[in-house]
């Protein structure tokens, strides 16, 4: 842990929520329900949640004892009670207390919070009744929203008790019901007033409040937590979204359309799923990698790819998407939220690629409509992704062109043309298809939830980057298992 990071955390570790001073750059409040949409930056990143009366939460005796022990751990520099320290999901309301920007987007009855920490998002159903009997507990639960005038009310149930509510480790049970009331204040800030109900943890319901402000320079990054841990950086970064904001993307160039674009909005799922991409015209270099991977697996080794190491690139969502995909569509951006692998892809419509790009896992995607087909061109990959479970490689030269065409049966037919001269002799095309899902919510995929030591004892790493940073080590006798993090070489 660096001294600079520690100092930043001390500045952020405010123990009182809901600061009331006006944030720099605050804008006048917009009107209507959609005033809550956009990118927001926390006014403070509270280490400890307090009630709106600035008092400690009304914990019962057992929960108070546990919370006190966790605060002592925090003071001693041990945060192993917090899953975010090994890049597992933050849960709620922990995600809203983190010192990173987030964006609220809406398309019809589909609303999403896109968080700036490790690709987490919340998909909120605005069109149905409350969920009262969740099928299983999830990291982000099952949020259902509604509008009360200009206030967005979100009720979330089904939150797993494996997460904590604040950085000090405030506990909760899986009976937690969290009701948020989000509204834009007259000074332009966003207020999130939360009612907490959990009879197994608290003696009564209580309220807390967080506030956020807009910042024209803020961006929601494509954050990859394991990469930061591997570099010796903290899992929870200090507020850097303003100081180190990326330059804005190129201005969108309006292109007149002869007919309205098809609507892709909704929740989708693959018609079929396969772990293999067949018939790829591998170059000599590509074939050598595939043969080396095959030999390792034939020898009984377990292959660790980018997907398995929780670093899946956008190309993985093109070739091997699993489970649900949420699509939010607007004239200037189409946003794809993938359940597995968990990822947010942004397609900037009628735009151009920047002249210079910092390579990343998701690349830079620009789209256009050709009649009823959405054409997406993506470059700027970092080369740390595989096409399939055999480890067919990609390089930074990877260039993909996707064509999404609505079919007569209501599904979406997809063609993906892949060009990568380092590993493939010529461009080739694969076909996929998505169908409408009956689900109201995606189930999140928390890849880093429980990496166990035995999972890596006979591992073969396609790339050194994929070595684990954190793993759960089983204790002996009465010693409980614990999560241990360190640099991959350790």
Annotate each PLM feature:
Residues 1-4:
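Positively charged n-region of N-terminal signal peptides that target proteins for export
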Residues 24-490:
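PEST-like low-complexity, intrinsically disordered acidic/proline/serine-rich tracts
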Residues 7-18:
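Bacterial N-terminal signal peptides
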């Amino acid at each position: 842990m660096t001294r600079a990071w520690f100092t930043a955390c001390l500045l952020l570790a405010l123990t009182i929520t809901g600061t009331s001073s006006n944030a720099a750059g605050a804008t006048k409040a917009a009107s209507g329900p959609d005033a809550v949409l956009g990118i927001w930056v926390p006014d403070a990143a509270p280490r400890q949640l307090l009630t709106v009366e600035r008092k400690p939460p009304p914990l019962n005796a057992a929960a108070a004892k546990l919370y006190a022990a966790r605060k002592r751990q925090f003071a001693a520099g041990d945060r192993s009670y917090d899953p975010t320290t090994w890049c597992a999901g933050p849960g709620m309301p922990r995600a809203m207390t983190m010192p990173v920007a987030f964006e609220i987007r809406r398309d019809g009855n589909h609303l999403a919070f896109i968080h700036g920490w490790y690709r987490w998002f919340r998909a909120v159903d605005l069109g149905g009744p409350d969920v009262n009997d969740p099928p299983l507990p999830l990291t982000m639960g099952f949020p259902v929203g509604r509008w009360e005038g200009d206030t967005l009310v979100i009720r979330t149930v089904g939150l797993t008790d494996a997460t904590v509510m604040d950085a000090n480790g405030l506990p909760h049970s899986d009976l937690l019901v969290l009701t948020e009331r989000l509204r834009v204040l007259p000074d332009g800030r966003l207020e999130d007033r939360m009612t907490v109900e959990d009879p197994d943890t608290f003696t009564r319901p209580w309220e807390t409040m967080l506030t956020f402000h807009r910042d024209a320079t803020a961006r929601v990054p494509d954050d990859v937590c394991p990469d930061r841990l591997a570099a010796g950086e903290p899992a929870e970064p200090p507020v850097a979204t303003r100081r180190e904001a990326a330059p804005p993307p190129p201005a969108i160039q309006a292109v007149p359309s002869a007919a309205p674009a098809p609507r892709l909005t909704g929740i989708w799922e693959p018609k079929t799923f396969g772990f293999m991409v067949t018939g790829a015209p591998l170059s000599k270099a590509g074939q050598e990698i595939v043969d080396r991977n095959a030999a390792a697996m034939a020898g009984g080794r377990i292959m660790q790819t980018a997907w398995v190491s929780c670093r899946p690139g956008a190309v993985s969502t093109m070739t091997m998407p699993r489970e649900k995909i949420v699509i939010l569509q607007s004239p200037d951006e189409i946003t794809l939220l993938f359940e597995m692998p968990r990822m947010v892809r942004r397609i900037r419509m009628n735009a151009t690629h920047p002249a210079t790009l910092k390579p990343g896992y998701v690349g830079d995607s620009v789209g256009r409509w050709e009649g009823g087909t959405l054409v997406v061109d993506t470059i700027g990959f970092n080369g740390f992704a595989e096409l399939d479970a055999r480890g067919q490689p990609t390089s930074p030269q990877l260039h993909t062109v996707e064509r999404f065409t609505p079919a007569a049966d209501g599904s979406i037919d997809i063609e993906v043309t892949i060009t990568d001269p380092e590993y493939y002799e010529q461009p080739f095309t694969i076909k996929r298809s998505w169908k409408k899902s009956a689900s109201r919510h995606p189930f999140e995929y928390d890849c880093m939830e429980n990496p166990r030591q035995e999972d890596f004892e006979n591992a073969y790493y396609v790339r050194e980057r994929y070595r684990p940073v954190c793993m759960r080590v089983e204790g002996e006798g009465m010693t409980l298992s614990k999560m241990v993090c360190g640099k991959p070489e350790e």
